[in-house]
């Protein structure tokens, strides 16, 4: 009797093990299929807004601080010279505790610009502070359902992060003041105009002694370091796409070197620096470095980035007070090639319309 019970127990145990193994295999297969599926969908999710034509309307909105009326007027005149029709948002010139209206008013302008079918692109009037307040009032589906070029930089990085998170490309570029400048910026503004027509650029990367050699291809995201680090882990954080293979770019102004150090450490402990395929370091201006021990901001950044076997270029002309601030297409696939201590190429790979 004991022998029979023993064999029954063995049989039951084997059956349970086989069942568990089958369930485990099924789970693993399902996980693999879901992961592969997510990866395929993720690469297809980012769409390119339609190119603009002469006579198209561009909305000017103020999601951040209150703009100067003369600067907005110059921006409107420049857009007219480019062949477009500028329309200033209903609340774009408002003032409320330094912001261009309440958060609800600023969000209302963004929603109007996204939903109005006659508006083909959206230009932020200026940076400053406050764009993050607008995000919680704009469902990500609004960006996805109304794919339009959102243009700006600095505090507008929050909008770029949200739009790319929703699966739509945007343009990191100068705003009303920058596009109105003449002289040495004419070539930059010419590139901006080409982007709006759907013509993507290839940039030469300047030589820098700290540049790290390498070649990589990935989805370009970035902007103001302080702004996108402040969105860490939220649904508006484009770095949630890190597993898709990103080329990260960042710049900042007026920050203490110790604060930038903490932000780089945040990217490191989140595993972002170990997963990005390449990095473009833009201009850092008016930073403070009390007793840092580093010669400059780039030397401090290099202390972090030198440990990663990826292409890195420094002092690319993008960001505050860079003199040029070349436009970047966020969410676009790019090819980054950098020589050790030398220059290189950043090529935007124009996607097929989806």
Which stretches of residues belong to each language-model region?
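ATP/NTP phosphate-donor binding region
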Residues: 42-118
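Short Gly/Thr/Asp-enriched flexible loops that form oxyanion-binding sites at enzyme active sites
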Residues: 127-144
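Short, acidic/small-residue loops that bind anionic groups at enzyme active sites
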Residues: 140-162, 169-175
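Conserved anion/nucleotide-ligand pocket segment
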Residues: 171-229
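Internal helical hairpin/lid segments
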Residues: 239-297
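ATP/nucleoside-binding phosphotransfer catalytic cores, i.e., glycine-rich phosphate-binding loops
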Residues: 286-354
């Amino acid at each position: 009797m004991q022998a029979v019970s023993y064999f029954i127990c063995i049989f039951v145990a084997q059956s349970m093990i086989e069942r568990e193994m089958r369930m485990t295999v099924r789970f693993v297969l399902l996980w693999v299929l879901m992961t592969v599926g997510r990866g395929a969908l993720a690469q297809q999710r980012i769409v390119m807004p339609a190119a603009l034509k002469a006579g198209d309307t561009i909305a000017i909105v103020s999601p951040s601080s209150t703009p100067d009326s003369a600067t907005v007027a110059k921006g409107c005149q420049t857009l007219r010279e480019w062949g477009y029709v500028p329309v200033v948002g209903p609340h774009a010139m408002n003032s409320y505790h330094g912001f261009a209206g309440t958060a609800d008013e600023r969000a209302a302008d963004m929603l109007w610009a996204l939903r109005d079918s006659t508006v083909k692109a959206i230009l932020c009037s200026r940076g400053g502070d406050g764009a993050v307040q607008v995000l919680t009032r704009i469902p990500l589906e609004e960006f996805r359902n109304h794919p339009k070029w959102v243009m700006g930089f600095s505090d507008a990085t929050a909008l770029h992060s949200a739009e790319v998170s929703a699966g739509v490309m945007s343009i990191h570029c100068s705003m009303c003041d920058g596009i109105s400048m003449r002289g040495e910026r004419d070539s930059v503004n010419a590139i901006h105009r080409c982007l709006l027509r759907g013509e993507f650029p290839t940039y030469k990367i300047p030589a820098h002694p700290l540049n790290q050699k390498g070649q990589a291809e990935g989805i370009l995201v970035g902007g103001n370091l302080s702004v996108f680090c402040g969105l860490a882990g939220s649904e508006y954080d484009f770095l949630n796409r890190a597993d898709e293979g990103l080329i990260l770019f960042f710049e900042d102004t007026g920050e203490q070197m110790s604060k930038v150090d903490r932000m780089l450490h945040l990217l490191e402990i989140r595993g972002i620096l170990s997963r990005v395929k390449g990095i473009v370091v833009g201009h850092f201006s008016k930073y403070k470095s009390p007793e840092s021990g580093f010669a400059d901001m780039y030397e401090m950044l290099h202390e972090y980035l030198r440990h990663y076997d990826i292409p890195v270029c420094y002092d690319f002309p993008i960001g505050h007070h860079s003199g040029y601030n070349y436009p970047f297409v966020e969410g676009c696939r790019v090819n980054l090639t950098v020589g050790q201590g030398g220059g290189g190429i950043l090529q935007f790979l124009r996607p097929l319309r989806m």
